[in-house]
């Protein structure tokens, strides 16, 4: 059976994948990669961690959510023999907020001031926020040290894997949240310029698409996996 390897968003934990994994059911095997919550690791170090955890001897599809999109792209560009497809969810190939790029040199000095959970929940989940999702978000944030968060934010501000995306040889699916207030539509347009053949599924959802619209996301991903398996 094809394994769907799930690479998490900025928090790096597994809890926020629970609604999506439940919606997938038994239709596909899943493997969730977790990132160390206390280590100041950038994209290269996290990609090495993921590379070492990829399935061996069985086909797999990579799904990079938000922050992890560049990691999924970089690994897909390496052309693993068992890789069958690449899914990007609310993600990007380069810094999605280029106007903030110059601030990366200040991040090591800047204090991390937590935003009120209610405001953060509305930013990430919009009108679809629930108490359960809010608790899951709070749990994920508790596991993330300030130094780890700073390292990941700094990595986002300087990332550009556009060249790697052009070398990806497997089919690409992009899950687009039409109400995303974190990753702008310009990120998708950039990806489509590089990979015009990529399949795009737009879902009326905020940035936390997999959490707030798990059923629709699961149907899109399962349909994509069936397609790449049948064409294999």
Which role does the model predict for each range below?
Residues 1-40:
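Conserved HGGG/HGGXW glycine-rich cap/lid loop of the alpha/beta-hydrolase fold
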Residues 64-68, 72:
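Gly/Ala-rich beta-loop-alpha elbow adjacent to hydrolase catalytic centers
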Residues 178-183, 208:
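Acidic catalytic loop of the alpha/beta-hydrolase fold
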Residues 205-218:
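Catalytic histidine-centered segment of alpha/beta-hydrolase-like enzymes
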Residues 43, 77, 82-114:
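Flexible "cap/lid" loop of the alpha/beta hydrolase fold
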Residues 170, 184-193:
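Short alpha-helix in the alpha/beta-hydrolase fold that links the catalytic acid
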Residues 168, 174-176, 180:
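Short beta-strand/loop motif that positions the catalytic acidic residue
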Residues 97, 115-166:
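Conserved alpha/beta-hydrolase catalytic His-Asp/Glu region
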